Structures are given as structure tokens and as C-alpha cells.
């Protein structure tokens, strides 16, 4: 058994996640593809099997602590990069419909290759800016859960993500130990965009004990038509 497979199995067990042999094989295939394409695409600075298993794959699966992702749930992953957390979540919840949004064309091409190589059905990579996706009627307020692992401030991520979440759905921001401080700064933005802070779940990654926070924001009203603002504005002038 590979180090990657062993780490994923043990970590998933510790997290209370049931994982099949097929899913473990998909994670191994995904890892191989990441390493294969990493030199040309700069997908990740972390390349060791155990590190990738913990800091990318298991870290992505922490989302299940906040949102169980029941059969048929529609999930959008904004600023997904190499596919985190969307692809690991899709592997473990194959019945979920997943859209992976990535603004870098080469990474979007990689995501399409990964979806094909792993045999993931009801999964699609979208090459676009988050601000444009949030305005698109095909995506606006269409998702049960919108997730982001990006490093932007929560107020910025809220403008990227909340417009795509349907009323009653949620926006899940994956953050580090300073999530509470960011939530305070993002309070007005969340309210303006139709959201309400529901909870902040603090947890630790298996094996490393690294601290993570999941910020759960419930969509309680429609996002005003003028949001998101044009590409680049949310980052320059957060709400």
C-alpha cells in the first residue's frame, strides 16, 4: 500500500469518513496527475505523498464537518486551483454535482483532464472569473453550497461566492485560526450580499494537528443585482 493510500485511509477513519478502495485509487491517480503536471503548471509547492494526502486531500474533506453534501447537492468551488477542495469532495461524494471555477486557463485545462482521468461524472471545470460567474444567470443563486479555499479576505470571498448560492444554501469558507477576526471584518459585506454568519467550526488536521476553521454563512436573502461588482473591484475595494 502506498504512503498516500495509507495516510488517506487512516486520516479518513479518524475524521469519521467512510472511504472505499475505488476512492483511494482515485486519490492515487489524482496525486500522480498533479505531480505529472506540477512542473509546467506550478499547481502546488507541496509534493510529498503524505503531505499532499494531509494538507490537500484530507484538508479538503474537512468541509464534510460543516456540510454533509447529500445526494444531488449542487456544489461550486470558487478559485479551485488544482481542484481543492472540489475534487476530493467529489471523489468522496460521487452523487454531488460539482462545478470547479478557475480563472487561470491552464489550470482549468488541467481540471478537465483530472475530471476525465478520474472518471468523475457530473463534474465540470469553468474557466472564468468568480465575478463573471456570479452575474451569469446559469449560475447565479443556483447552488446548494459554494466553497472557497482561497487566501483572500472573507469579505472579498463573500462577494465572489454568495451570489452563486441559492437562498437557503450556504457559502463555506475554509480558513486558518484567525477566522473569527476575518468574520468580524466581513460582517457588513455578508449582510449586504444576503448572508448570515451561522457558525465557525474550529478543528485540527489529522497527523499534523494544524488548526483550521470552517466559516459557514447561510444565504437568507437574494443578493442585490449590482453584486458581484466587475472583475478586480471586490479585491481592491472590499465591502
Swiss-Prot record:
It holds the Pfam family GidB. It comes from the Bacteria. S-adenosyl-L-methionine binds at residues 79, 84, 130-131, 149. It is an enzyme of class 2 (transferase). Coiled coil: none annotated. Its EC number is 2.1.1.-. Its main location: cytoplasm. GO terms for cellular component: cytosol. InterPro entries: rRNA_ssu_MeTfrase_G, SAM-dependent_MTases_sf. Keywords: Cytoplasm, Methyltransferase, rRNA processing, S-adenosyl-L-methionine, Transferase. GO terms for molecular function: rRNA (guanine-N7-)-methyltransferase activity. It is found in: Cytoplasm. Belongs to the methyltransferase superfamily. RNA methyltransferase RsmG family. Specifically methylates the N7 position of a guanine in 16S rRNA. PANTHER family: S-ADENOSYL-L-METHIONINE-DEPENDENT METHYLTRANSFERASES SUPERFAMILY PROTEIN. HAMAP family: 16SrRNA_methyltr_G. This is Ribosomal RNA small subunit methyltransferase G. It comes from Pelotomaculum thermopropionicum (strain DSM 13744 / JCM 10971 / SI).
Amino acid at each position: 500500500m502506498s504512503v498516500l493510500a495509507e495516510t488517506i485511509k487512516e486520516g479518513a477513519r479518524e475524521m469519521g469518513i467512510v472511504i472505499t478502495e475505488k476512492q483511494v485509487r482515485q486519490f492515487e491517480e489524482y496525486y500522480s496527475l498533479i505531480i505529472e503536471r506540477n512542473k509546467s503548471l506550478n499547481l502546488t509547492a507541496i509534493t510529498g505523498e503524505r503531505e499532499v494526502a494531509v494538507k490537500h486531500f484530507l484538508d479538503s474533506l474537512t468541509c464534510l464537518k460543516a456540510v454533509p453534501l447529500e445526494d444531488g447537492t449542487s456544489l461550486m468551488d470558487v478559485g479551485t486551483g488544482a481542484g481543492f477542495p472540489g475534487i476530493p469532495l467529489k471523489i468522496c461524494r460521487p452523487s454531488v454535482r460539482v462545478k470547479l471555477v478557475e480563472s487561470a486557463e491552464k489550470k482549468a485545462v488541467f481540471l478537465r483532464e483530472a475530471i476525465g482521468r478520474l472518471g468523475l461524472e457530473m463534474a465540470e471545470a469553468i474557466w472564468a472569473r468568480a465575478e463573471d460567474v456570479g452575474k451569469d444567470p446559469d449560475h447565479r443563486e443556483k447552488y446548494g453550497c459554494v466553497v472557497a479555499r482561497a487566501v483572500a479576505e472573507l469579505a472579498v470571498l463573500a462577494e465572489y461566492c454568495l451570489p452563486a448560492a441559492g437562498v437557503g444554501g450556504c457559502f463555506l469558507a475554509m480558513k486558518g485560526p484567525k477566522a473569527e477576526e476575518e468574520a468580524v471584518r466581513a460582517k457588513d459585506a455578508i449582510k449586504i450580499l444576503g448572508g448570515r454568519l451561522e457558525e465557525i467550526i474550529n478543528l485540527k488536521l489529522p497527523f499534523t494537528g494544524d488548526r483550521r476553521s470552517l466559516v459557514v454563512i447561510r444565504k437568507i436573502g437574494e443578493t442585490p443585482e449590482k453584486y458581484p461588482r466587475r472583475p478586480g473591484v471586490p479585491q481592491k475595494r472590499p465591502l
